[in-house]
Design a protein with these regions (language model features):
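ABC ATPase "signature
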Residues: 79-80
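Catalytic Walker B motif of ABC-type/P-loop ATPase nucleotide-binding domains
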Residues: 20-23
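Conserved catalytic motifs of ABC-family nucleotide-binding domains
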Residues: 16
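H-loop/switch region of ABC-family ATPase nucleotide-binding domains
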Residues: 55-56
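Helix N-cap at the start of a conserved alpha-helix in ABC-type nucleotide-binding domains
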Residues: 31-33
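A short, surface-exposed alpha-helical micro-motif characterized by mixed small hydrophobic
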Residues: 61-63
């Protein structure tokens, strides 16, 4: 659960990576654990850590991201600032996805 995620993050930080990769870090967690893991990731973002985060937590992604990439069928469909991608998506698929996740 969340304890395993936090331990994995601590092990990663011990290696002092230039970039931290997160692939759906909250997908298998209980709802109460999700917020704990997101708080750890938010703190890393506030420290200025470079991270690549794959997530369906759209509100969180919007808050902590400096750049957003929207993928569809494994291809980059849209890329830009959180404001641009979340508020003014260009592609029809991205518009549909964002409107269903508000």
């Amino acid at each position: 659960g969340g304890q395993q995620q936090r331990a994995a993050i601590a092990r990663t930080l011990a290696m002092q990576p230039k970039v931290i990769l997160f692939d759906e870090p909250t997908s298998a967690l209980d709802p109460e654990m999700v917020q704990e893991v997101l708080n750890v990731i938010r703190a890393l973002a506030e420290e200025g850590r470079t991270m690549l985060l794959v997530t369906h937590e759209m509100g969180f992604a919007r808050q902590v991201s400096s750049e957003v990439v929207f993928l569809h069928q494994g291809l980059v469909e849209e890329q830009g600032s959180p404001q641009q991608v979340f508020e003014n998506p260009l592609s029809a698929r991205c518009k549909q996805f964002m409107s269903s996740n508000r």
